[in-house]
């Protein structure tokens, strides 16, 4: 079943006439055309009969025509009202309720004479949750490039270097491999600074005998990677090394349990129980992982409350961590493809 037919099924289920998609990544997912419209309207209308209409600034029309999109294009000037160029009456319209602003909703009511709204967010999330072979190949390449980033960062470590300097070196050097954009702000934290799970790299200087936490990812042809390694620089103290070994055991055990049909919460419990049994449960404050694809964090989450089942074609992260203020912060994260038989680890830098 195609992506569009899934949307049509949802239109029928909710007795709606059309779906209105405005999130740039979701529009790309359905059309193959990516745009960052800023304040301008950029939207895909999918009608119950399968017709697709893309609204975009007129200056982008030729780019859309050169893409894989085969539907109708409504290009508008900044001085024009896009809705006046495609007059419609849509009784019930499905929208991305998590993203559409109140102002845009008012425009839809006026422009398309909408009487009621439904939600198409979950349907799109479920579609994006299962990756195609093409998507998997892009994520695999993004993961390979993330491995290279870690390699670049580790090779640059030296006593006295700052966190910020290591970040800059990674992001500048990886451009030589064709990377134009990181998945998110690269994180490099030294020693006990890594006890802040989302710390900001700064001017802290690297000392001998401490851990260095790298959390980073790259975007390859719109698809993200996201990995974390905690690397020895010298010989950290005994407690820090004990924490590292516990996190590694938790991650390894959780990954080995991955296969279709297993509830996501069970994977979280495996890692969390290991950490708790070793006395560090209170220092593991976040979920075990999340979905990965066009965004570095997407549906579904690997958490203690998610009863949904793992399915072949999902790509998730597994990232247990222990963060003890004044001592150390350790997180290890890999990107995992759920296969028919079990799993494939996509990130490979040594642990």
From Swiss-Prot:
Indicate what this protein is called per its UniProt record. Uncharacterized peptidase SAB1567
What's noted on cofactor binding? Binds 2 manganese ions per subunit.
Could you tell me which species this protein originates from? Staphylococcus aureus (strain bovine RF122 / ET3-1)
Bridged cysteine pairs (disulfide): none
Q: InterPro entries of this UniProt entry?
A: Creatin/AminoP/Spt16_N, Creatinase/aminopeptidase-like, Creatinase_N, Pept_M24, Peptidase_M24B, Peptidase_M24B_aminopep-P_CS
Manganese as a keyword of this entry, yes or no, is yes
The signal sequence is none
UniProt-listed Gene3D superfamilies: Creatinase/methionine aminopeptidase superfamily, Creatinase/prolidase N-terminal domain
């Amino acid at each position: 079943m195609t992506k569009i037919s899934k949307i049509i099924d949802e239109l029928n289920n909710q007795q709606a006439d059309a779906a209105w998609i405005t999130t740039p990544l979701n529009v790309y997912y359905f059309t193959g055309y990516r745009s960052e419209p800023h304040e301008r309207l950029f939207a895909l209308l999918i009608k119950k009969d399968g017709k697709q209409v893309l609204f975009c600034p007129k200056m982008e029309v030729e780019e859309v025509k050169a893409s894989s999109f085969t539907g109708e294009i409504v290009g508008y000037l900044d001085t024009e009202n896009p809705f006046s160029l495609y007059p419609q009456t849509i009784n019930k319209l499905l929208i991305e309720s998590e993203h559409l602003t109140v102002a845009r909703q008012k425009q839809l009511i006026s422009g398309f004479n909408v009487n009621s709204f439904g939600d198409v967010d979950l349907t799109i999330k479920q579609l994006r949750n299962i990756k195609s072979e093409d998507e998997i190949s892009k994520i695999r390449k993004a993961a390979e490039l993330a491995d290279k980033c870690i390699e670049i960062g580790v090779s640059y470590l030296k006593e006295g270097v700052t966190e910020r300097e290591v970040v800059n070196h990674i992001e500048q050097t990886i451009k030589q491999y064709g990377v134009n954009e990181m998945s998110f702000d690269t994180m490099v934290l030294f020693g006990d600074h890594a006890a802040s799970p989302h710390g900001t790299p700064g001017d802290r200087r690297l000392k001998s005998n401490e851990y260095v936490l790298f959390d980073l990812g790259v975007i390859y042809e719109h698809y993200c990677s996201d990995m974390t390694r905690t690397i020895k620089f010298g010989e950290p103290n005994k407690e820090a090394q004990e924490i590292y070994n516990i996190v590694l055991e938790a991650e390894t055990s959780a990954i080995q349990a991955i296969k279709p049909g297993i509830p996501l919460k069970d994977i979280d419990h495996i890692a969390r129980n290991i950490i708790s049994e070793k006395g560090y449960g209170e220092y593991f404050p976040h979920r075990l992982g999340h979905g990965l694809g066009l965004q570095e964090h997407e549906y579904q989450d690997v958490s203690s409350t998610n009863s949904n089942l793992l399915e072949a074609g999902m790509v998730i992260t597994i990232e247990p961590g222990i963060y003890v203020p004044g001592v150390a912060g350790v997180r290890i994260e890999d990107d995992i493809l759920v296969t028919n038989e079990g799993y494939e680890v996509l990130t490979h830098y040594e642990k």
